[in-house]
Amino acid sequence: MTLWVLGLNHQTAPVDLRERAAFAGDALPRALESLRALPQVSEAALLSTCNRTELYAMADEAHSLVNWLETHAPGLSGHLYQHREAEAVRHLFRVATGLDSMVLGEPQILGQVKDAWAVARAHGALGSGLDRLFQQTFSVAKRARTDTRVGANPVSVASTAVRLAQDSFARLNESTVLLIGAGETIELAAKHLSEGRVRRLLIANRTLAHAQTLASQHGGFALPLTDLERHLAEADVVFSATAAREPLVTRAQVEQALRTRKRKPMLLFDLAVPRDIEASVGELGDAYLYTVDDLERAVEDNRRGRREAADQAEAIIDLQVARYVETLQATARQAPLKRLRAFGDSTRDELLAKARQQLHNGKPADEVLEQLAHALTNRLLHPPTAALRNAALNNDLELTTAADRLFPEKPGYQHPPIATPIVRTDDADPAP
């Protein structure tokens, strides 16, 4: 099986395509079950955020994975990137560290990667290969953030949106802000808004208790989602980030809110994928709509400022990828030896048990030992003998040369011992 990653993100696909590719809520476990049903796939995990959808899999080939994604959301293939083996490892390390994010070094992505791992594990989609990869990913991301400043003064999509709102409304502290949702992105927005203070903070969510908890933490007022339309006109600024499959805020609702506000401008930030606010709202004269794609341009300065720290993090990742691949290769080299030893042990145990039974039945010991020796020799030498016979017929010089080294003609000759590979398990840099 080969390690593959296939995906699309904010760099390769626009928001309308990303929202079609997203897996939200109950769709994620069902998708994992569907993936694991493919005969070419032994392990799988799905990472789905507002900026990316990625499929990690141990699979025979990538074609079946592309077809599966195309079935989920037709039209993706022209926007997909694909990595295998070492490059797939590097990609996941970079994603979890925040080096592949719209906001360079953003801290939320590591939690989202952990969530993807936890869901895949809970639904039986992970095996030892992907589980080991994700565990190493968490370790590498932690080290990169600890040893560099790539995560210093963390900037998120939510904080970038709040900063834009502050720049747009000189007196945001005199404005009413409406938050739709109660997930991590909205929690971050509420935190940044409460630090800068706003006149009134409204929080609407499908589960009222979640909105009430968030409101109590940040001095806001909780609303059931069913009251959203009634309170929309009160909002000068709207932030929305839910997992809804259909828009929660329509053009007609915003038009009505603007009439009620006597055309006083509204600023709306749609931080969700799929989108929470109908795209046509941005066509209204007094409504200013920003999506996650629009925010990419706003965070470019942040990306430049973190480039030096990112370069340091890339160096850490390069080293850790090399070590991880070295460990996998060492394990793979040991596999044939383990199979050979297991074959020898099982053959010995089987024939020895048979010989003991013969002795127990009164058969002469010399006869039993003679039969045991012949049977053991024949059983152990049959596979290599058959393989060498086929190699001679097919002119397989590689195998016959290896046999010459294993079984030299000169009696008593011994090859030098084969050194056991040293597999590094610590994170320390190699000694100079």
Swiss-Prot record:
EC number: 1.2.1.70
Sample GO molecular function, one term: NADP binding
GO biological process, one term: protoporphyrinogen IX biosynthetic process from glutamate
Region (Disordered) location: 409-432
The keyword Lipoprotein is annotated on this UniProt entry: no
Residues where substrate binds: 49-52, 101, 106-108, 112
Pathway: Porphyrin-containing compound metabolism; protoporphyrin-IX biosynthesis; 5-aminolevulinate from L-glutamyl-tRNA(Glu): step 1/2
Pfam families: GlutR_dimer (PF00745), GlutR_N (PF05201), Shikimate_DH (PF01488)
UniProt site (Important for activity): 91
Cross-referenced InterPro entries: 4pyrrol_synth_GluRdtase (IPR000343), 4pyrrol_synth_GluRdtase_dimer (IPR015896), 4pyrrol_synth_GluRdtase_N (IPR015895), GluRdtase_CS (IPR018214), GluRdtase_dimer_dom_sf (IPR036453), GluRdtase_N_sf (IPR036343), NAD(P)-bd_dom_sf (IPR036291), Shikm_DH/Glu-tRNA_Rdtase (IPR006151)
Family stated for the protein in its record: Belongs to the glutamyl-tRNA reductase family.
Function: Catalyzes the NADPH-dependent reduction of glutamyl-tRNA(Glu) to glutamate 1-semialdehyde (GSA).
Assembly and oligomerization: Homodimer.
Additional notes on this entry: During catalysis, the active site Cys acts as a nucleophile attacking the alpha-carbonyl group of tRNA-bound glutamate with the formation of a thioester intermediate between enzyme and glutamate, and the concomitant release of tRNA(Glu). The thioester intermediate is finally reduced by direct hydride transfer from NADPH, to form the product GSA.
Protein known as: Glutamyl-tRNA reductase
